């Protein structure tokens, strides 16, 4: 029973966000949009800056600046890249005790795919969670929609 209660408490403390969408764009197109970290400030709500710190063909370390309602934070992730298939993110630095997640791109045809976004996170302390938690959850929950809108802007113009 204690383990079960502990598990329930752990689930409450560590929020999870999962979103899925079917889009009329290829897995390659969606992967390229999500992997284009430097373009995030142009279209991601709340993203005020982004930069690639290190990059190799299979891995990228990137920092993202987020600001909303007067609250600003920067976090850095190391992303494992599987070209046109997935991007797995792990926390390097930021206001989190834990931040892991990623994107999966599943082809449905040559011109359509399913995108999946999942994020597990826990803030370093309650004060940061109170100040930034709601803002971060809102931004993370809207990421799939933001990338879907971006895909329409970028790929429908071609």
Curated annotation (Swiss-Prot):
Q: Which Gene3D superfamilies match?
A: 3.30.530.20
Briefly explain the null phenotype.
Deletion of the ratA-ratB operon has no effect on bacterial persistence on rich medium for this strain, but does affect bacterial persistence for E.coli strain CFT073.
The molecular function GO annotations come to:
ribosomal large subunit binding; ubiquinone binding
Q: Does the keyword Transferase apply?
A: no
Which GO BP annotation is one of this protein's?
negative regulation of translational initiation
What task does this protein carry out?
Toxic component of a type II toxin-antitoxin (TA) system. Binds to 50S ribosomal subunits, preventing them from associating with 30S subunits to form 70S ribosomes and reducing polysomes. It does not cause ribosomes to dissociate however. The antibiotic paromomycin blocks the anti-association activity of RatA. Overexpression results in inhibition of growth in liquid cultures, and in a decrease in protein translation. The other gene of this operon, ratB, is not the cognate antitoxin in this strain; in CFT073 however it does fulfill this function.
SUPFAM superfamilies reported in the protein's UniProt record: Bet v1-like
Q: Which UniProt keywords apply?
A: Stress response, Toxin-antitoxin system
Q: Subunit info?
A: Associates with 50S ribosomes.
Q: Belongs to which family? A: Belongs to the ribosome association toxin RatA family.
Q: Protein name, please?
A: Ribosome association toxin RatA
InterPro entries attached here?
COQ10-like, COQ10_START, START-like_dom_sf
């Amino acid at each position: 029973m204690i383990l079960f209660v502990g598990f329930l408490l752990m689930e409450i403390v560590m929020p999870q966000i999962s979103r899925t969408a079917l889009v009329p764009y290829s897995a390659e197109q969606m992967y390229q949009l999500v992997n284009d970290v430097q373009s995030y400030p142009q279209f991601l709500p709340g993203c005020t800056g982004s930069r690639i710190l290190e990059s190799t063909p299979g891995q990228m370390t990137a920092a993202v600046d987020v600001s909303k309602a007067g609250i600003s934070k920067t976090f850095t992730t190391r992303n494992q890249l599987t070209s046109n298939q997935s991007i797995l993110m792990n926390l390097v630095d930021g206001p989190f005790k834990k931040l892991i997640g990623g994107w999966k791109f599943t082809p449905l045809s040559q011109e359509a795919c399913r995108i999946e976004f999942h994020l597990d996170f826990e803030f370093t302390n309650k004060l940061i969670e109170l100040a930034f938690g709601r803002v971060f959850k809102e931004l993370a929950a809207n990421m799939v929609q933001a990338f879907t809108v971006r895909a329409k802007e970028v790929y429908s113009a071609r």
